[in-house]
């Protein structure tokens, strides 16, 4: 049986690893994408993992990949076949893509860095908004606010024209924008029915890799949704009960850790400090609650379908949300 140690690691980020499956799968067309339990704040990874976080991120991505195929193709190939046993539940076999050099942010509410930009300029990514908006207010229509992909430091917000320049194909960028807004609108409606507000989210798209012989055909290139999708790490999810315009909202994400880090006395420079057990437990509870609220099923159902074991024996159920969110 293949193990992670048998595979060639080709990329490692703050949360995910990518492994080459060329030697064990159907040629060079697939990769193994593994979501870890690592968590970062202020661009530094903490030494303390959040149990089951990687499984929540993967399970939610699968939930959305399966439900959005009619909107746009995605890179998911398998959740079990080809996945090493130790990575079950937290890994996907995915298509190899040539990723576009922009992150595709859609905002339905004015919050985070968008709120800061609006306060300063009255606009977000070059899109002028009406005067008098309050923090966390719902926008009349979702807006597409792309950003650069920064290898180091923070991504930079850009307007659509700059995104089209970076991609090098305006028509393709228009397809990306339209798909992003349609994905957001579909997910926001589903979340609303589940008592959750999808305030904003980030998508990443790619094209079939020319290395594998999939790309380069006649006509429009196939647009493929990649990376993770609509998870608490790539999105702001707020509980609808208690939503109130005029301030930051509680959220189903790492804001609980971010708030602790801000109050801990840490100077926000690496190395990041260890996270106390009660903060770990509270953060895990928020991630699991996000999965269960959005999917309508217990988190254990995802573990059973993939043959995975929970990481978090001894952790209690979901805690109530109380930390205010104001991420980027």
Q: Language-model segments: which ranges?
A:
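Active-site loop/lid in soluble adenylation, ligation, and acyl-transfer enzymes
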Residues: 1-149, 267-274, 278-316, 320, ...
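Generic recognition of stable, solvent-exposed alpha-helical segments in well-folded globular domains
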Residues: 55, 59, 171, 175-178, ...
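Catalytic activation segment of kinase domains across protein kinase-like and atypical kinase folds
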Residues: 199, 203-255
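Surface-exposed, gly/pro-biased binding rims or lids
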Residues: 230-289
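A long amphipathic alpha-helix within ATP-dependent nucleotide-binding catalytic cores
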Residues: 168-199
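Short, active-site-adjacent segments that bind or coordinate small-molecule cofactors and metal centers
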Residues: 95-97, 193-201, 206, 283-284
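A short mid-domain helix/strand-loop element embedded in enzyme catalytic domains
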Residues: 138-170
């Amino acid at each position: 049986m293949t193990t992670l140690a048998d595979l060639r690691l080709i990329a490692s980020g703050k949360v995910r690893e990518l492994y080459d499956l060329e030697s064990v799968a159907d040629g060079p067309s697939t990769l193994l994408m593994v979501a870890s339990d690592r968590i970062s704040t202020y661009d530094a990874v903490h030494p303390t993992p959040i149990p089951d976080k990687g499984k929540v991120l993967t399970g939610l991505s699968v939930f959305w990949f399966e439900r959005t195929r009619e909107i746009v193709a995605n890179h998911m190939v398998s959740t079990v076949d080809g996945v090493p046993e130790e990575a079950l539940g937290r890994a996907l076999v995915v298509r190899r893509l040539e990723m576009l050099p922009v992150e595709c942010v859609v905002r339905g509410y004015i919050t985070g860095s968008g709120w800061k930009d609006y306060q300063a300029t009255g606009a977000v990514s070059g899109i002028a908004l009406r005067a008098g908006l309050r923090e966390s207010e719902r926008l009349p229509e979702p807006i597409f606010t792309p950003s650069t992909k920064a290898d180091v430091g923070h991504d930079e917000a850009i307007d659509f024209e700059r995104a089209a320049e970076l991609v090098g194909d305006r028509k393709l960028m228009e397809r990306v924008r339209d798909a992003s807004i349609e994905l957001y609108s579909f997910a926001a409606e589903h979340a609303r029915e589940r008592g959750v507000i999808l305030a904003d989210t980030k998508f990443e798209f790619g094209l079939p890799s020319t290395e594998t012989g999939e790309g380069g055909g006649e006509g429009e290139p196939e647009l493929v949704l990649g990376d993770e999708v609509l998870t608490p790490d790539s999105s702001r999810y707020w509980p609808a009960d208690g939503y109130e315009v005029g301030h930051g909202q509680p959220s189903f994400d790492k804001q609980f850790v971010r708030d602790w880090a801000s109050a801990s006395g840490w100077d926000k420079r690496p190395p990041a400090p260890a996270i106390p057990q009660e903060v770990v437990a509270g953060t895990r509870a928020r991630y699991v609650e996000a999965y269960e609220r959005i999917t309508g099923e217990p988190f254990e159902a995802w573990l059973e379908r993939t043959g995975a074991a929970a990481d978090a024996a001894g952790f209690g159920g979901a805690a109530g949300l109380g930390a205010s969110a104001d991420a980027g």
